[in-house]
């Protein structure tokens, strides 16, 4: 760039959600998750370059209700060798009547997916993922830091406990 011209640091950064071309003969791996997984897609892809074809869903996976709606499209028709997946951070989010993030104590804030429904949704999603015959790996939900808008510190522990019950029932390892 010319002197005094700002350089856009994201200008040359590849889109982690863009489709990739498979290298023949390498295992196919699919990442399913939210913005946390979007953040680790490119570094993981670089780390595993030449070892696997690392794909990810073309969007933020959001809550389990979004997963149930889109899972068939995300899986597509090709064979997967490994599926690394997570839902939770958007399930435990408190939403207002207009879809805005709210702290739990604010008027009108309700958890997007109550924990019992989350567990049932995960069970349905795992049943669908198992039909792919891929090796499945669950990723726990990241902790909620203090001051997170729309989320309550400690909720991820409860949601991870619900997820653990599902993964144990299905024999799926947790990463």
Task: Locate each region found by the language model.
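Alpha-helical cap/lid subdomain in secreted, periplasmic
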Residues: 47-53, 65-175
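Short intrinsically disordered, low-complexity coil segments enriched in acidic
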Residues: 1-6, 171-175
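Serine-esterase "nucleophile elbow" of acetyl-processing enzymes
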Residues: 4-79, 83
